[in-house]
Amino acid sequence: MQIKLANPRGFCAGVDRAIEIVNRALEVFGPPIYVRHEVVHNKFVVEDLRNRGAIFVEELDQVPDDVIVIFSAHGVSQAVRSEAAGRGLKVFDATCPLVTKVHIEVARYSRDGRECILIGHAGHPEVEGTMGQYDASNGGAIYLVEDEKDVAELQVRNPERLAFVTQTTLSMDDTSRVIDALRTRFPAIGGPRKDDICYATQNRQDAVKQLADECDVVLVVGSPNSSNSNRLRELAERMATPAYLIDGAEDLQRSWFDGVERIGITAGASAPEVLVRGVIQQLQAWGATGADELAGREENITFSMPKELRVRSLL
């Protein structure tokens, strides 16, 4: 058995920044540091930060007064921001800047009196935060659609004053079909100048397609609640390549590799490389050889830290 590695894979710039914000806050201010929602959707990362003194909560009413709170990479609604400000909580915002871009678009549509359609998955924290940027007090509305069926059933108030945005971690192929359905049903609909699906999601989906084309089975390292990791598994499966989503080496089953010659490995944007290395080691212990990276797109994007943490960390 030969191992092939997708390129790129694993951490993106937004995840790197979010984890570093929690780490630096712990270094500068000391524990406990409260984090609203898992800062990124990866069990290993969250457990490591928890062991260092981060406390993860789902709502601000679980946070005591006079503590530091970090908003996760997925972003929060305006209501959550107002609640934190009203309580005087000290907040560091780890929202991915590419998610913030979508938030700004939604807020602009709201101010302009345009209804907004969000393409995304119900219940995902990014979707909840994005929908919470729309102020419906002026009579507008924001709608959530997941697929073409939702588009066909959607009733809007004014199809001439309509715009769409998307969750950043969706399948590019699925989203393209939904956008086509929206443009067919609502010809006047507006949208972002550039696709809202982030560069890291696009790059990892392109890479897993190449991997699935060259391998007999694909392993996606990522947690079950990671949207982008699930999309990678789905993409490989659509190419008729068996694919498994695993948190790490402990989830591997030897029977998956019966009769397999080429094993492909990728990782979601919130999965650290140490987990990939653990998977490689286990496969090599079972007789697999090599760990060759496929040619891929180089990523050199970085996002700046909040000023206070950046300055303090240099003292």
UniProtKB/Swiss-Prot annotation:
Q: Give the residues the record marks as binding dimethylallyl diphosphate.
A: 41, 74, 124, 226-228, 270
Q: Name one GO molecular function term.
A: 4-hydroxy-3-methylbut-2-enyl diphosphate reductase activity
Residues holding isopentenyl diphosphate: 41, 74, 124, 226-228, 270
Q: What does this protein do?
A: Catalyzes the conversion of 1-hydroxy-2-methyl-2-(E)-butenyl 4-diphosphate (HMBPP) into a mixture of isopentenyl diphosphate (IPP) and dimethylallyl diphosphate (DMAPP). Acts in the terminal step of the DOXP/MEP pathway for isoprenoid precursor biosynthesis.
Cross-referenced NCBIfam families, in alphabetical order?
ispH_lytB, PRK01045.1-2, PRK01045.1-4
What residues bind (2E)-4-hydroxy-3-methylbut-2-enyl diphosphate, as annotated? 41, 74, 124, 168, 226-228, 270
Q: Which UniProt keywords apply?
A: 4Fe-4S, Iron, Iron-sulfur, Isoprene biosynthesis, Metal-binding, Oxidoreductase
Q: Where is the active site?
A: 126 (proton donor)
- What name is this protein filed under? 4-hydroxy-3-methylbut-2-enyl diphosphate reductase
For biological process, the GO terms are: dimethylallyl diphosphate biosynthetic process; isopentenyl diphosphate biosynthetic process, methylerythritol 4-phosphate pathway; terpenoid biosynthetic process
Q: Which Gene3D superfamilies match?
A: 3.40.50.11270, 4-hydroxy-3-methylbut-2-enyl diphosphate reductase, catalytic domain
Q: Which reaction is recorded as catalysed by this protein?
A: isopentenyl diphosphate + 2 oxidized [2Fe-2S]-[ferredoxin] + H2O = (2E)-4-hydroxy-3-methylbut-2-enyl diphosphate + 2 reduced [2Fe-2S]-[ferredoxin] + 2 H(+); dimethylallyl diphosphate + 2 oxidized [2Fe-2S]-[ferredoxin] + H2O = (2E)-4-hydroxy-3-methylbut-2-enyl diphosphate + 2 reduced [2Fe-2S]-[ferredoxin] + 2 H(+)
> Its Enzyme Commission number?
1.17.7.4
**What domain of life is recorded for the organism?**
Bacteria
Q: Which Pfam families match?
A: LYTB
The entry's free-text remark on the cofactor is: Binds 1 [4Fe-4S] cluster per subunit.
Cofactor dependence is on:
[4Fe-4S] cluster
Organism per entry:
Pseudomonas fluorescens (strain ATCC BAA-477 / NRRL B-23932 / Pf-5)
Positions bound to [4Fe-4S] cluster: 12, 96, 198
Q: Which family does it belong to?
A: Belongs to the IspH family.
Pathway, per record: Isoprenoid biosynthesis; dimethylallyl diphosphate biosynthesis; dimethylallyl diphosphate from (2E)-4-hydroxy-3-methylbutenyl diphosphate: step 1/1; Isoprenoid biosynthesis; isopentenyl diphosphate biosynthesis via DXP pathway; isopentenyl diphosphate from 1-deoxy-D-xylulose 5-phosphate: step 6/6
